[in-house]
Amino acid sequence: MAHQTGIHATPELKEFFAKARNGSVRLIKVIIEEEQLVLGSHKELKHAWDQDYDAFVLQLLDESQPCYILYRLDSQNAQGYEWIFLSWSPDHSPVRLKMLYAATRATVKKEFGGGHIKDEIFGTLKEDVALSGYKKHVSSCAAPAPLTAAERELQAIKINEVKTEISVESKQQTLQGLSFPLRPQAEEAILLLKQKKINYIQLRLDLEKETVDLVHTKHTEIQDLPGRIPQDTARYHFFLYKHSHEGDHLESVVFIYSMPGYKCSIKERMLYSSCKNRLLDSVEQDFLMEIAKKIEIEDGAELTDEFLYDEVHPKQHAFKQAFAKPKGPAGKRGQKRLIKGPGENGEDS
């Protein structure tokens, strides 16, 4: 959306960015006005970054108006001071504004300089972007996500085959650390799904540009789902599964990672597997969208209504004792009976 509407920073904002990156500015608030990115307000340094944080950030958040906030840390990298990039999109703001700000987020980062940004936060409530929320975000990102058996196998492949053509110079050499950014159209689709305005998203990895791209958001019923799964390439899918459970009507978001076995190259398999966890972290933590179930499949034919229901609501398997013969009377059993011949019972032959 950003490139379609032509939203860019004003010359004044660009000039302020250049001065602020390594100056005494602690906070920059950016808003969209008349289809341009403009300076909303700014704050000068006072104390240490964590002492200034809540006092500066929270007072600038409007409950009905999205905005971007760039907050300077006290740490530095090779390009200068490191910054936090906050995207504020309150629940009570108009949907059109939410979409506009979501789609323009990448432009703000580009105009400011992505190399200066250490962390990104997306919030709809103040507690999401407060200092405590930021620390939780950092802690969760630092914790390695659990790996499936398939991912452990792929991790071993990656470690043992460092000389493959995969280029990840700017990323960690572990599956947990590999992350491709979402393109604006993909971010917009996730917000629409969260608001239940669409019911299906298909995403792909651009292996050359190293981004997560939107394929389409076609309306999808359960019977359509198998046909959405490509047979020759991997994909990520989000599906709003509408169903009834124990008398309640539910709408559960299901994530589907489709990988058609060894029809894909090793490079594609490794990248899709390694980017999956970070994508899910972003959807759950940055977009605050709850995912009821995460599924991995090879073939779209697996996706039936019964299969999805059992995945979202797994049956409680009670322990069933094998059939046993009824026990005899309590106490010691009598002597074994003997089959007697004629006359042995006192009867006449």
From Swiss-Prot:
Q: Indicate yes or no for the key word Cytoplasm.
A: yes
Q: Which UniProt keywords apply?
A: Actin-binding, Cytoplasm, Cytoskeleton, Repeat
Q: What is the annotated localization of this protein? A: Cytoplasm, Cytoskeleton; Cytoplasm, Perinuclear region
Q: Which GO terms describe its biological process?
A: actin filament depolymerization; barbed-end actin filament capping; positive regulation of neuron projection development; regulation of lamellipodium assembly
Asked if the Swiss-Prot or TrEMBL record annotates the protein with the keyword Transit peptide, the reply is: no
Query: What family is this protein classified in?
Result: Belongs to the actin-binding proteins ADF family. Twinfilin subfamily.
**Its job:** Actin-binding protein involved in motile and morphological processes. Inhibits actin polymerization, likely by sequestering G-actin.
Binding partners and assembly: Interacts with G-actin; ADP-actin form and capping protein (CP).
Which PANTHER family does the record match to this protein?
Answer: TWINFILIN, TWINFILIN-2
Q: What is this protein called?
A: Twinfilin-2-B
Which gene is annotated as encoding this protein in its UniProt record?
Answer: twf2-b
